[in-house]
């Protein structure tokens, strides 16, 4: 039942809302039911991000684990860091600085009520990411046992190569946003049947390729 599942349960909808409201008993109950339903069908891997429901997706799951500590040795946890949600002026940003990534991971551990994250993903590409900052962040996280694997989200091969060279660690996963209307992961150069077309002749990942060479 609890063999490593090839499916991952996405928790973006758990927590009660994308706001600063506190967790409610109803949100915790709904998360517990979702958690139990996933386990019943053999899904033991759970995906989070520090921004999901303003952190409450992790917090509500942490409450479930407090009530069921025996599950900590059964499940695997994946979460993401690197995005700062838009402020009141509608301005959001990426932050792959060592300070932000380290603090984000530590905060996620606290919300999730666990001592280690099975896989920490950099949440979408940050065009301003710097090799020294990435190296410092992941060196600290691995050496202190706070994470077990490193991954990325929605990145191309050159971005992955850049991160691997910068950190000295292998990228173990790349979470992609895939749908019938989201196909840039498949073909980033030919806008077939696309009314908007692709205006740029630059291959995605050119910046990272140049930084590597």
Q: How should each PLM-predicted stretch be described?
A:
Residues 125, 129-213:
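Beta/alpha (TIM)-barrel catalytic core signal, keyed to glycine-rich beta->alpha loops juxtaposed to Asp/Glu
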Residues 1-76, 143:
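N-terminal binding-site loop/beta-alpha segment at the start of enzyme catalytic domains
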Residues 15-21, 84-91, 184-185:
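A short acidic, helix-capping loop that chelates divalent metal ions and anchors anionic groups
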Residues 11-13, 48-50, 79-81, 124, ...:
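A cross-domain feature marking catalytic cores of carbohydrate-active enzymes
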Residues 9, 38, 46, 61, ...:
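Conserved, mostly hydrophobic/aromatic
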Residues 109-130:
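Active-site groove signature of glycoside hydrolases
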Residues 72-98, 123-124:
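Structural motif corresponding to the early beta-alpha repeats
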Residues 23-38, 94-113, 133-136, 157-162, ...:
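Short, acidic/polar
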